[in-house]
A protein has these predicted regions:
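Iron-sulfur (Fe-S) cluster-binding modules
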Residues: 1-67, 75, 79-91, 105-118, ...
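N-terminal glycine-rich "phosphate-gripper" loop used for MgATP/nucleotide binding
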Residues: 93-97
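Short, well-ordered alpha-helical microsegments
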Residues: 99-102
Length: 228
């Protein structure tokens, strides 16, 4: 899932300081799952903004908080917010960067304030209470060849043909030796499966054209039936 983190309150307050009417919109997708941007977090941010204005002796803030199914879906965002957004000059979004941009596109006359920093595509380790980056969305997945361990993401240098000379005792030289060397993990995984032929396979340099930005994916739009 997309992993995100709420911005510092000071930064959110600064972006919102010139608005007397604000709509806070959470997202029930990724940011809600990781408890950063759902309905509960929207209500908490609403209370904090109201408190901040009162403590500074400013005029009363008119603010509403809600959450929608997915902010990254044009139709859902437009349909869910069309009636409520018209009363507010600015919207605080608790979605990832995609959600923020979707709202900005659908409501071009509104100021969309991002309250969340999008970090990476990752895995949640509930027991450790941590999120780990696992995928770069590179557009050319080779996980079958690497035992389900991504060298593009988990190797600090994104090497494709084995470890560099900087690994020591299975640890990467980048990050003060805290991270496992991805290619040592790959070697051990493939060895367990008797698939070391995949480890020794030579891989050509990546074709970065498949990950050029901005990207799009999808077929041709549906043809509308002509009216008789």
């Amino acid at each position: 899932m997309i992993i995100a983190q709420q911005k510092p309150l000071k930064e959110i307050f600064e972006m919102a300081k010139n608005f007397k009417r604000l709509l806070i919109v959470g997202c029930d997708g990724c940011t809600s799952i990781i408890q950063v941007g759902g309905e509960k977090q929207a209500q908490v941010l609403k209370s904090l903004l109201e408190m901040e204005r009162r403590l500074k002796g400013k005029k009363k803030l008119t603010i509403e908080a809600s959450s929608i199914l997915r902010q990254c879906d044009r139709d859902i965002a437009s349909t869910s917010l069309r009636s409520s957004v018209k009363d507010y000059p600015a919207v605080i979004s608790l979605a990832c960067g995609v959600g923020v941009q979707t709202l900005a596109e659908q409501f071009p006359d509104k100021i969309i304030i991002p309250a969340v920093d999008t970090k990476f595509i990752g895995m949640h380790d509930t027991e450790a209470g941590k999120f780990y980056e696992m995928c770069r969305a590179c557009g050319d997945c080779i996980l079958f060849e690497t035992g389900g361990i991504c060298p593009i993401t988990r190797c600090a240098k994104s090497l494709l043909n084995g470890p560099c000379g900087g690994q020591a005792k299975g640890k990467c030289e980048v990050g003060e030796g805290k991270n496992d060397c991805a290619w040592i993990l790959i070697y051990n995984r493939l060895k367990e499966r008797n698939k070391l032929d995949l480890f020794t396979k030579f891989r050509l340099p990546r074709d970065y054209r498949v990950s050029e930005h901005p990207r799009e994916l999808g077929g041709e739009p549906e043809e509308k039936e002509e009216k008789a």
